[in-house]
Amino acid sequence: MNVGQAAHLSGQMSGQAPQTNQVGGSGVGGADGLPQQMQDVVGLGGLDTQFLLMRNTMRDRIFEYIGRKQSSTDWRRRLPELAKRLEEILYRKFLNKADYLNMMRGPVEPQLQFAIKTLSAQNQQNQQNQQMPRQMASSSGYGTMIPTPGITQSATGNSRMPYVTDNTGLPSSGATMVPQGANTGSMSNGYQHLTTSVPLNSTTSSIPSTMGPVGIQRQVTHMIPTPGFNNQQNVPVNPDFSNGAGYFNGEPTVTSQMQQQKQFPSNQNSHQIQHIGGHSNSGMHSNMLENSSAYGLSDGHVNGGMGVHGSNMQLTNRSAASEAYINISTYGNSPKPVQQQFNQHPPQRIPTPVDISGSGNFYNTGSSALTAANNHSMGATNLPSRSRMNSMLHTNQLNMQSIQPQPQIKTEVLDQPEKMNFQSSQLTHEQLIRQQHSMQQHQMQPSSQFVQNQYHLNQQQPNSQHQQSILRSNSLKQPQLSSSHSMQLSEQGALPHTELISSQATEHADIPIYQGQYQQRSAHDNVKGGQVFGHLSSSQNFHSNASHDSQQLLPTNQQLDDSSNDVSYVLKGSQPEQMHQAQWRPQTMEKAPVTNDSSLEKQIQADLCQRTMSQDGAQQPFSSDWRLPGCTVTPADPALPKLPSGGLEQAAGNIYYFRQMKWLLLLFHAKSCLTPVGSCKFHRCFQVQELVKHFENCKRKDCSYRDCRRSRMVTEHYKACVDLQCPVCSNAKKLLQRSAELASKQKPPEPRKIAQQNTAQRIMNGVEGDIMDIDLVSDEIFDSQPSVPKRLKMQPVSPSTAEREVSMPSNAGLILQETHSELPDQNNKVGQLKMDVKIDPRPLQKPAKIGYGTDGNVPTARHNVAPGGSNEIKTHVKQEIMPIDKETSETAPEVKNEANDSTDITVSKSGKPKIKGVSMTELFTPEQIQEHINSLRLWVGQSKAKAEKNQLMGHNENENSCQLCKVEKLTFEPPPIYCSPCGARIKRNAPYYTVGTGDTRHFFCIPCYNESRGDTIEVEGQNFLKARFEKKRNDEETEEWWVQCDKCECWQHQICALFNGRRNDGGQAEYTCPNCYVEEVKRGLRMPLPQSAVLGAKDLPRTVLSDHIEDRLFKRLKQERQDRAAQERKSIEEVPGAEGLVVRVVSSVDKKLEVKPRFLEIFQEDNYPTEFPYKSKAVLLFQKIEGVEVCLFGMYVQEFGAECSYPNQRRVYLSYLDSVKYFRPEIRTVSGEALRTFVYHEILIGYLEYCKQRGFTSCYIWACPPLKGEDYILYCHPEIQKTPKSDKLREWYLSMLRKATKEEIVVELTNLYDHFFITMGECKAKVTASRLPYFDGDYWPGAAEDMINQLRQEEDDRKQQKKGKTKKIITKRALKAAGHTDLSGNASKDAMLMHKLGETIYPMKEDFIMVHLQYSCSHCCTLMVSGKRWVCHQCRSFYICDKCYDAEQQLEDRERHPSNSRDTHTLHPVDIVGLPKDTKDRDDILESEFFDTRQAFLSLCQGNHYQYDTLRRAKHSSMMVLYHLHNPTAPAFVTTCNVCCHDIETGQGWRCEVCPDFDLRKMLDLLVHASTCRSGSCQYPNCRKVKGLFRHGMQCKTRASGGCVLCKKMWYMLQLHARACRDSGCNVPRCRDLKEHLRRLQQQSDSRRRAAVNEMMRQRAAEVAANE
């Protein structure tokens, strides 16, 4: 529980202000003992993270400061404990956050000295107190004195109390959840009761651990409070059992001394610092709240706090014990049952030994707190939050009796040792060993210990008592141990004798029984902050139980038992990391018959309906207002689980949380309940359904509808909650998860019945031994089978037919186990139970999407869980939310994480993780499923012949055929392979040679291989031995992947099933085929997931550009549809239209284009830029086809803004555009063009309009169709889509541009050749290559570089007087004839380059389209962006800029416009307006590794076989592309571990499951570090190993190509690094070379494109010549 809540509840839930009457001035309810992540909590589940950070920082400072002083191993091992403990002292001193901050700002040393001094004093006092037992035991006179009015009474004359003030600073976790002063309010009779000021028995070790407090207890017990005066008693409390035992472990020693003159001190470890902040709680009265006896008896005798004969005990105030009673037996050994009562007075407490010792064990909520009806009574103490204790006077002659008798419930007094409930804990392995060692030290000693709380002081019959307390071995060996309360309750709100409220047994069957209760952590959580134990070997805190003979029952090996294997969930405010408390019942437990009656139903209804009332509204947010109409109001809910040990405030808070959780579950049930109205077994289900319908639509904050505001509050919190420790949300999720997990554990050969329709499934509620009711409706569990990997079609595994027995533990609930367990009835008689089971986890109507934030952790479940730990597993969070399938009748509200996702997983009935969205078909309706299956069998996209062939195969299906498409074997298109030297594509089935691995693999066509006459071949500067070459044939085929349905076990293609292998969880995810899915939907067993369950195109981030294009597109489509409707004389609804379109920008990144070196050399004197910055963008169009968003269109653009240098300033380059022919509907517009074409044109026009508005002046388009068999963006086009010729493609662009011209978006159209290579009309611009816009991937930059190299080679050959290998070089005479006057130096090279380039471009000049968005000057050809434009009205398309106009005015009239004419035309100025001064992009950067370049996206598609050649594949590929877009950090490819050669599954965090130490990301970070590290003794992990690999790489002769394993490993990491590295000056070895290699690959692609264009032009010229 948190600080804020502790103080709040302690006051408000008792009807009083929070009490701060505690020792040392410490505030109420500190949270310093909680785990760090649970400290300083304010509000409902909210964390004061700032305060938490401050405290953690202070701990670190203390740790560092002390660590510098000491360096021994033993000291450093204990240092974290000491640092935490010292910080807790400081926290006690500075409770306020502001004070704490001021303290932190100062030096740490003075504060540390104070903390150390306080801690030393506490340890010293602890040692002194160990010598006190005889003194205290002998001082009996004081206890009979009546305190004098007005005089504060002290328990002893000892002046040790000054330590009390200082030693309060170290409470244990949860310690501060109770007011540490016992004065919690005035008594009802007006008396001021005694106040027992107890120093928090936290971690101080200053509290007496032996007899001191015990003697005081007895004395105080006999004191009579004087009316009107405060009798205060300052008594230190033993810290060793502050974790929940709450009694003095020295007490049994005292008793033993008095009887046998023997003393066994309970704490010998004061020399060391123990129990640092890990205890559950420390307020002694809170200890008593949770227990009725020191060792777990529900109604055991509590005498003087520790078995002191004649001493009476008054229970403390329990402000939150609304569902829990403390069962107190009579004093002495009287077998009479305790009469119990409740009244409705505010609670208060009389100082009794309880206040000091808290001698009862802690029970979780409801364990000792047996539920009862309104009128149930309890002797002398009224613990519920709405009752007050009547002031009572007890002496050692009086038994406890009721002051206001009420109808009673007689409780069975368990005064025999064999009926005691001993509390144990789940132990970590280390703690078990240490505790066993401690136990072995004391097994040979007489153990009189804490069981004496149930004995008489004198133990007249020790032997018989010992024999009675011996645990039967069969009881110890039971995997399900019980600690039930054998109390029979009345029918009002109570369970019948066959269904007792008890705690689930611990999972540890063979743990020795230790004294009281102490804390531990769950085995799998022991790394988190929790209970810190001292050296158990030196402490005698842990003793065996009751007798000498019981020693033989203690096992020598404490082992963790996984028989229960239950998931325990966490309640905030309980033990750190929710230490599970288990109660052992040392009785023989046998199976008892259980009748199939409606008792469980009644209990569930009581759980969910009964809302306890409070006179103080602040006590329960869900008190009276949360009662459902007609629900019975009782003083205690009948089935609340036991509160973990935490005291009054903790008990109150957990009830507070628990009720919220139960209400939340009830809302879930009502929301998903499918039963007819009035027939649901929850008779108030209909009213809650009405409430749900109301508050889901209600927007009023002050709505007066019953429970509306509170219901909305809890559901909204659930939606937004990302706290894995939230006591409400996390528990609700885990309950539902556990419900499905329990269902999945049952694998009977036939459907079995677990109960009638009214039976409830009990689910573990987090603290071991606690249960909570979750309703499961009857249904069938199908036979399940071991999980089969989904990727490969393997031999089927037969389902398990092993019959499972259902165990009935002592819980009234039905916890499914594989073993029998015993259920004691009310008379402690036993019977045997064996029953068939049947579970119907009904599906959700609306599955929950729970977002946990990025890289966060979420609970999941799996099968292989380490023994002893709960099945709470942490899984790496992906970035896409997958809704949870609870497989129960509960449903969860839909929560959408606006950031990236996390993955919520539950366990399905088959035992596999049920991951939502593993198949897109889960979102389909049955009609959409049928539409999808019909579409599969049409083979849309294939040629008519292939489609008919596949359809024919479908008519002849066999058992190996896909159940959906009816075809057996389908293969992917093999990725294209290119020859490394020549760049030619290696044809299908052609032979080739290969060498190398990974990205360094090279391919050689047969001609290139044969041309090399030597023994080696040089490629990219590397020589490869021919002997190492491997000859292959390009005929490899990859078959489509398969997936098997977990229901019907039929096989389908993953593509047909729209199965996402990335969510397959390593082959463990459950998959339901479409056929079974439809059947389940028709039977009402499940509902289709909402469309938001799997993130789609609409969930991609929107940008200004995408919105602009979409707005224009939708407006134009609406107008087009209206025109068609008008033409056909129909309404607009009667004509089909394009629907489901989404435009998104998926990549928008800044890049730099480096100018090629040869070209730069020519213009270096002209200050030509070395690089051009630009922004690269990728735009995609999606359309929802048959329920799936299919990517139909994509384009890449380059934007060179105003900041870019000339000649690229304000220019845009449309670099690539691609589409596939699946657009729907396939109709034509009014103008006769295809609607598909209309849409694509509007996207381009919208983009040009957007560019013009931003201030760009021109757009450049190279209308170049792809090569046959190659793709630009989308991989593998359908056969029905023809690749256009260049003229068709050019006309396609020009028709679009003509539309844009009509809208005045485009002002001029020209081509690259006419604009730059010749001077036409009055153009006065210089013809030079420096004016050409320089774009990445364009035709001319690459061609110019090749030409420069060729010109240089020719020049070298001419100098050597050799004939040129190509045609003769252009002479200067020819250049002069062409008009070039300056032929000196680089100018001649420029002229020759332009001449040669012009000759190449001229035949295809129309393909290089120049689009002017602004007017260009007719003289200088500059695009005008400011000033005035001078226009000639007589001449068409003549405009000049201000600069040229000024120059024009300096000329003579005959030289002015128009030139070569006698006429003079007047120029009119036109202002250039509406053009922004810059081209700043308002959109944010959008990075996508997969869309960074079109080659990167192609590589993604090729490597994963994301093909678009058929509609079925296009749908699957688009689904996967969207998955990658929404999960950018998920690995793109399945990577192979270089150590074990196993695949590293995607989504596994780049980890190899076989090699646990291999983490790829860490290795890449290490690579960067090692490349710059110069330290010979670097401590960075594995730094020297990587350096050794570097040295090996320089010396190795074998190399990676030769098979060297070390070289392969290094190359693999270097390649991965180079892909992601953006640093041009990176120091990682070979990084630049690898980048250059990648650049060459892109250059090869560009070269192939140019070569194909040149070949096409050559063929065209040949055709023209032939026709002539």
UniProtKB/Swiss-Prot annotation:
Residues 1-34, 459-493, 528-551, 886-912 are annotated as: Disordered. A zinc finger (PHD-type) spans 1002-1079. Its main location: nucleus. Keywords: Activator, Acyltransferase, Chromatin regulator, Coiled coil, Metal-binding, Nucleus, Repeat, Transcription, Transcription regulation, Transferase, Zinc, Zinc-finger. Pfam families: HAT_KAT11 (PF08214), zf-TAZ (PF02135). It comes from Oryza sativa subsp. japonica. GO terms for molecular function: chromatin DNA binding; histone acetyltransferase activity; transcription coactivator activity; zinc ion binding. This is Probable histone acetyltransferase HAC-like 1. Residues 459-469 have a biased composition (Low complexity). It comes from the Eukaryota. PROSITE patterns: CBP_P300_HAT, ZF_PHD_1, ZF_TAZ, ZF_ZZ_1, ZF_ZZ_2.
